[in-house]
């Protein structure tokens, strides 16, 4: 839910004097200011879910996510101050991600939890999907898309098998 849409929805809920509880998916965009988060809470928002992805600035930039860890953390603080529950989606095994970056991301996310900035999270293994920007520019991410074949792991029936060097994405979980 883009911040402008959220603002309009909240204003309409309040204008109509509706008594509702709701939650939505967001990007941890800087436009989620403390004032907007307070408005959301006043309009009945109890939770948001959003992607911190790999929780690493290098990878967020490579993914062209438009946020940094510092800017996302500022938004998380605004949600906390408004008493809005935050669930973060994360991923691991993103192309070019190192084991050291994974460990640092884990430490960082645990720190967000200790600070009360996120209340829950879930780590998903990276899946390359047909219509993703990564599938459109695989060389930018150091991957080779393998011939289309039935993937051992299927996500929305559009997952692509790929390899990084000689390592296939068809690993057993």
Language-model regions, residue ranges each:
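Hydrophobic, well-ordered secondary-structure elements that form the walls
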Residues: 50, 88, 109, 121
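Hydrophobic, Leu/Ile/Phe/Ala-enriched alpha-helical segments that form helix-helix packing faces
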Residues: 13, 109-113, 173
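Catalytic cores of alpha/beta
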Residues: 35-37, 95-112
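Flexible glycine/acidic-rich beta-alpha junction loops that bind and position SAM and/or redox cofactors
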Residues: 4, 58, 62-63, 92-100, ...
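Short, hinge-like loop/turn segments at secondary-structure boundaries
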Residues: 40-41, 66-67, 105-107, 139-140
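Structural beta-sheet core signal
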Residues: 24, 88-90, 123
């Amino acid at each position: 839910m883009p911040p402008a849409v959220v603002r309009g929805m909240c204003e309409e809920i309040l204008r109509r004097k509706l008594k509702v509880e709701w939650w939505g998916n967001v990007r941890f965009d800087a436009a989620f200011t403390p004032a907007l988060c307070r408005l959301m809470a006043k309009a009945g928002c109890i939770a948001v879910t959003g992607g911190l992805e790999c929780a690493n600035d290098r990878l967020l930039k490579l993914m062209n996510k438009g946020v940094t860890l510092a800017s996302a953390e500022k938004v998380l603080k605004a949600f906390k101050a408004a008493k809005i529950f935050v669930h973060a989606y994360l991923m691991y095994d993103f192309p070019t991600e190192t084991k050291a970056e994974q460990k640092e991301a884990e430490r960082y996310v645990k720190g967000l939890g200790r600070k009360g900035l996120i209340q829950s999270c879930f780590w998903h293994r990276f899946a390359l999907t047909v219509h993703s920007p990564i599938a459109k520019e695989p060389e930018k991410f150091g991957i080779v898309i393998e011939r289309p074949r039935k993937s051992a792991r299927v996500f929305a029936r559009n997952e692509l098998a790929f390899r990084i060097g000689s390592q296939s994405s068809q690993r057993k979980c």
